[in-house]
Amino acid sequence: MRGYLLIAAASLAFAQEATIKVDVDVVSVYASVRDKRGAYIKDLTKDDFTVMEDGKKQEIRYFSRESDLPLTIGLLIDVSRSQEGLIEVEKRAGAQFFQQVLRPKDAAFVISFGSEAELLQDLTNSQRLLAKGLEGLRLNASVGGLHPSPTGAKQRGTIMYDAVYLAAAEKLKDEVGRKVIVLITDGMDFGSRVSLQEAITSAHKSDAIIYSVYYVDPRVYGWGGYSDSDLKKMSEETGGRVFRVDRKNDLEDIFRQIQEEVRSQYAIGYNPAGQSSGGGFRKIEIKTSNKELKVLARKGYYANKN
């Protein structure tokens, strides 16, 4: 059954002051490691990693090369007018992605966003329900949703930041295990009630990794489009990265790459040492003993005040 993300404007305006409690006795970080050619390195040990928090070395207490923790995926799809010609491809590729990546104890949900955000399918492990949700993709969300507009009013644009904020704060914050947002868009935001930084903060507080898929319709833009700078910031801050659909990589290829990455992560846990009891954002840096390897992991987390 289709549902809507009905969040009052006042609650979104309050986003900067909202607090999501995080137990910082154990900080969990999921990291993927690639070599210069981009191949994933899957045979490292705990001793190959160094974890720094705010410049202080931390002792790794928990480590796993093959994380069997549940995986929760939010698939967020831009259905603004510039993306109209891509919707049918996204339906097919999205359904195939869920079939490939989801295991029995995993779950996923689907949100479309244009002038408003619409929850097409809530958290489920059912391939049938997820496929049905994807079939609900359509140009803009013109009824209900986050930003209802009176008859005759202009469309508000593409509320990309709001969609990310809501996916993290409303759907992922209470889930356990690994949490991933896959964001398919041309990278433009127009009309969101929250800022780019508020969307990133929401992802941090929910421990969500953002993988952005920069997808533009060549019939609209050629092979140009808007800048992907916002997508890079969201993804890199949370431990993900940006993929570009182009002549060499179609959407199905990129979904396969995302699947490989989330299944190639190391789970690293530590108890923060050498920190004051104050809250706020704490920076994390993860390195390997081999300087030629690239580590992809979130940049930090928000700690509670004791």
In which residue ranges do the predicted regions lie?
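Sec-dependent N-terminal signal peptides
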Residues: 3-13
